Each structure stands twice: as structure tokens, then as C-alpha cells.
From Swiss-Prot:
<dbReference type="GO" id="GO:0005615">
    <property type="term" value="C:extracellular space"/>
</dbReference>
<feature type="disulfide bond">
    <location>
        <begin position="36"/>
        <end position="87"/>
    </location>
</feature>
<dbReference type="GO" id="GO:0007186">
    <property type="term" value="P:G protein-coupled receptor signaling pathway"/>
</dbReference>
<protein>
    <recommendedName>
        <fullName>Thyrotropin subunit beta</fullName>
    </recommendedName>
</protein>
<comment type="function">
    <text>Indispensable for the control of thyroid structure and metabolism.</text>
</comment>
<feature type="disulfide bond">
    <location>
        <begin position="39"/>
        <end position="125"/>
    </location>
</feature>
<feature type="disulfide bond">
    <location>
        <begin position="47"/>
        <end position="103"/>
    </location>
</feature>
<keyword id="KW-1015">Disulfide bond</keyword>
<keyword id="KW-0372">Hormone</keyword>
<keyword id="KW-0964">Secreted</keyword>
<dbReference type="InterPro" id="IPR018245">
    <property type="entry name" value="Gonadotropin_bsu_CS"/>
</dbReference>
<dbReference type="InterPro" id="IPR006208">
    <property type="entry name" value="Glyco_hormone_CN"/>
</dbReference>
<keyword id="KW-0732">Signal</keyword>
<comment type="subunit">
    <text>Heterodimer of a common alpha chain and a unique beta chain which confers biological specificity to thyrotropin, lutropin, follitropin and gonadotropin.</text>
</comment>
<feature type="disulfide bond">
    <location>
        <begin position="22"/>
        <end position="72"/>
    </location>
</feature>
<keyword id="KW-0325">Glycoprotein</keyword>
<feature type="signal peptide">
    <location>
        <begin position="1"/>
        <end position="20"/>
    </location>
</feature>
Amino acid sequence: MTAIYLMSMLFGLACGQAMSFCFPTEYTMHVERKECAYCLTINTTICAGYCMTRDINGKLFLPKYALSQDVCTYRDFMYKTVEIPGCPRHVTPYFSYPVAVSCKCGKCNTDYSDCIHEAIKTNYCTKPQKSYVVGFSI
């Protein structure tokens, strides 16, 4: 009985180490428009984590679609819209952004994901900041 229990625990640990860790993660982004007076700080969720993948030897003989690797990407998401404060009348003050509801390991879809290897470091404000909290700005 103890041997079965011990083996099942070891099997569970081995499977747990092999699983992917891809889930919604809190993320803060800064949004500004050159015509508007303020920068808006938004707290949202994005998909982040690690996915199990294998690098195939013999890449020369495989079609391109077989060479792509899985990434942590959206399974389900919704869009929220906020109003950037301090915009003149001729400028549309609304900004829409995705909120991750659930994530999965899969192929990167460029229709709604940024599939680059290295992010550009532009997540900062050059104008006075306003924070956005659940439906209204402060």
C-alpha cells in the first residue's frame, strides 16, 4: 500500500514538473496621446508564463509550420475601453485594451497578440499621470 502511494506521489510530481505554467498575470501599462494633457496608468491582465516545447533536429527537412513553437497566449479575453483625460474636442479620447480572462499554450496569433521575441521598452509616461481604477479615472 505504501509503495503504491509513494509511486503515485512521484508520478504526480513528475507530471507537475512537465506541465506548462501559463496564466493571466497582472500588468500595468501607460497610455498617452500626444494631443492629450495626461498619461493614463491602467492595471490589466495579460497572459504570461512558460510553455513546454521541443526543438526539432533536422529542421531542413520539415515544412515551416512544423517549426513554430508554442507560446503563452490568450484563450479567452475581453476588451475594456477607457477615456484619456485632458484631450481637446477634436481628438477621440477613448482607448481600448485587452484583458486576459484565461490563457493557453498555443501558436501565436498575430491578429490579437504581439508575437515578437523582445519587447520594446516604451511602457512609461512623458506627461502627468492619472490612474484608472475599475470604470472611472481618479
